[in-house]
A protein has these predicted regions:
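Conserved NTP-donor binding/palm subdomain of two-metal-ion nucleotidyltransferases/polymerases, i.e.
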Residues: 1-11, 17-269
């Protein structure tokens, strides 16, 4: 959709494929010189020097994005088939684009590139899409406000005419500007802290800091289903996975920084 190749860089390529071929996919990617990174319930990450990064998806969203995951669970039924290739309709692509952006926006944040993507796509496809269908589906996804705010802000920011932003638009633009390309660690830590605290509060109306720490060390089934299917199926292995997480924490600077931010938030409670 961009005017020239190379104007839009991506950190990875997301490809949805038939889960029945997961082992076949792994064998093929490894035979092509790729290294298997994170292996989650819904995706496998493959890396190859100098810059190749593929996220091979069994589903488009994990269980921690339950609303989006359920909506896109049977997306294959709505794809356009061309031989072995399956593609979104323009409308369904736009819905996925907004859901994917909202996922990052509500987690660690996302950068100004979101507005540019929105502007470029709509410049090409706005007049040919079925907006009645889009409004109906956006409502199911709970993204009516996010889509409208993104679209209107993109139009205002990227126009060559002087415009005045509303206060909510200014706040959204400030957030996108300060989120870098892939979000900010501080934002991610704060949002994850709130999500975890909500889970703890479901079981205890007055959760203590100790219970929060306990939940972080020994999370619920949803965590293991997303990050370690082996531990999800075999509960006896979970203590060993906890040890692995602690060792990984000690060896990874970004994870240590996130935990320090999380600890500061917990102290304020």
């Amino acid at each position: 959709y961009y005017p020239e190749l190379g104007m839009r860089q991506m950190s990875d390529n997301d490809i949805l494929y038939d889960a029945a071929f997961r082992k076949t996919m792994q064998q093929y990617m490894l035979s092509q010189g790729y290294t298997l990174g994170a292996k989650k319930a819904y995706e496998d990450d493959y890396f190859k020097l100098p810059v190749y990064n593929y996220e091979m998806h069994l589903s488009l969203f994990g269980n921690n994005d339950s609303d989006f995951s359920q909506y896109f669970q049977n997306i294959e039924e709505r794809l356009i088939r061309n031989g072995y290739l399956c593609c979104f309709t323009d409308e369904d692509f736009y819905l996925y684009f907004m859901a994917h952006a909202a996922k990052h926006y509500r987690s660690g944040g996302t950068g100004l590139r979101h507005l540019l993507d929105c502007y470029v796509f709509l410049s090409k496809k706005r007049d040919t899409m079925d907006w009645n269908y889009l409004h109906c589906e956006l409502e199911k996804l709970g993204l009516v406000d996010f889509e409208r705010d993104s679209r209107l802000l993109a139009e205002k920011v990227l126009t060559d005419q002087p415009v005045t932003l509303t206060e909510p638009e200014s706040k959204m633009l400030d957030f996108l500007t300060c989120s870098g390309t892939y979000g900010a660690l501080g934002t991610y830590a704060q949002n994850e802290f709130q999500k975890t605290m909500q889970k703890v509060q479901q079981n205890d109306a007055h959760p203590s800091k100790l219970k929060y720490v306990w939940h972080r060390l020994f999370p619920d089934d949803d965590f293991y289903q997303n990050y370690s299917m082996f531990c999800y199926r075999h509960k006896w292995a979970r203590p060993f996975y906890t040890v692995y997480r602690l060792v990984r924490l000690c060896l990874t600077k970004s994870r240590r920084k996130k935990v320090r931010l999380e600890a500061k938030l917990l102290q304020k409670k």
